[in-house]
Amino acid sequence: MVGFEKHGLMPLFRVFSENALDAIHSASLEVLEKTGIRIHHGESILKMLKENGCIVDFGKGVVKFPSYIVEEAVKKTAKTFIMYGRNLKYDFKLDGRHVYFTTDTETTSTVDLSTGEWRPSTLDDLEKLTRVTDALESYAAGGHLTTALDKPNNVRCLYDYAAALNNTEKPCGWSVYPPELAIQLTDYQLEIATAAVGSEKKLKERPIIGGVFCTESPLQLDGRFVETSLKLAKLGFGCDVESMPLAGATAL
């Protein structure tokens, strides 16, 4: 089956059988081809997809992906990926055969250890929690466990990322918001990462930074975050697209 690398050594714990994986893959292709995905705030992305063979409704912002395009993209996608930390001893490879634990990201509330109060998280909380996860051997990565709600919203992600890098040597996640400033803030975060490792050359050799953005329910993407990820990919940095909708919580 296209898109799933076969290994000689299979994981000890498997959730899905090969038939189940085939069924999920086929159903995903069908949804992408027949229903499509809405991409808002992304006129340039829509044009790019149209030029590369996708069926685009510019009025609705809906893109339908012929299955052969998806299959070809899956073939070209790297089957392994290295997560880099500031300290190389914390590097690890994502290869489908190993499981690693990391913290969640951007939680907005914290239980105050002094008072027991449930309150909005702060930069101080983020720094302290990052140091805890840095010390715990059970976590392979972390650093963006909560967010600095005591900082201005338009630059909060910069405080978050700088705090993460200053308090862990492990791989750490990052994100950009608000979306209308995504490209500009990404440039600033690249500067922060460059300062952390010493030079642009070192950052490209060991990219401790990468794009992370989430899908929206139902079947939507914010084009501004897609543009950000494309920018990072062209620079040689990996990108992580997460399926954020949760049944019963965010799914409409």
Question: What positions do the PLM features span?
Answer:
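Acidic/polar, glycine-rich intrinsically disordered N-terminal extensions of enzymes
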Residues: 1-124
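Helix-rich catalytic cores of soluble enzyme domains
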Residues: 120-252
